[in-house]
Amino acid sequence: MPEIFRFYGFSFFFYSREHEPLHIHVEGNDGMAKFDLVEDEFVLKIVHNIKSNDLKKIKEVIDCNKDIIIKHWIKYFGKED
């Protein structure tokens, strides 16, 4: 499970045997979320047990680090989508 980074007590990562589309998982504080890259923007697809204020921070971190996430995906999986 390649972890890309940690912020606010949350881990941002991919699973080793991922599938398309390009996406990122977030886990921490007994919650989880998944964001898919849709038309050049990460969109929330799944969320469980994450407070709305934490979700807002997570989305900001993802938006500010979008290029890093995409580069890590391409490096690990070999393609963008």
What is each PLM-predicted segment?
Residues 1-12:
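Negatively charged, low-complexity tracts enriched in Asp/Glu with abundant Ser/Thr
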Residues 4, 43-46, 65:
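Generic preference for hydrophobic/aromatic residues in regular secondary structure cores
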Residues 10-15, 35, 73-77:
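Aromatic side chains
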Residues 15-52:
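A short, structured beta-strand/loop element
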Residues 53-81:
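C-terminal structural segments of small proteins and small subunits
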